């Protein structure tokens, strides 16, 4: 308020300025007016300097929080993360990697240890899923191989699940991700079994799911080579001697990350 009072008083005395210059007896009053004008200049300088900085108040590009993308993960023990914590599951580690790049996710997992293709479908039907999802991952088949089920039956049931996955992704095959079956022949659990035979059978099952995925344009992540590194690195195996450790799941997530990022970018 004091600043505005000074401003008003200066304008009130402006008309007398020329007269004051001609009358030396009023020199003190002239000095007072000059002082008043100086205060007026200072007042405007302070007023401008106190104005908000519009450039700094604007949001920084890239810091705007986007809604979380919805992710549905379908599978068996390799998706639910048997013998590891929830945070160590590969879908959760994938979500963590995305979060580090400011991409948040909302994960729904439908998976259980021991499930075959037909049991996964039963499990899906028992859940109240809410499509469409921004991303759907599918990893299934190891228990079909383990139980000795016919590979042609696996082909039919996998194709059915693959098309359901595309349906859950709003009909967009590019928003579905298929992972290969890891090779459990390299684990301590298989030490008393025919490891070579197991590996060959898994290769055949993986050929089926890869060809099915490529036929409909679904991205494919081959994690089988990573699982075979366990023969020289026991830290890639969980304490149960059969399933992957959190360390191996981290490698899966890292391999899937660039593909998933491309999926999310292309689906915008």
Residue ranges and their predicted role:
Residues 122-268:
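Alpha-helical cap/lid subdomain in secreted, periplasmic
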Residues 16-19:
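Intrinsic-disorder-associated, low-complexity terminal segments enriched in Asp/Asn/His/Tyr and depleted
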Residues 51-113, 123-132:
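Serine-esterase "nucleophile elbow" of acetyl-processing enzymes
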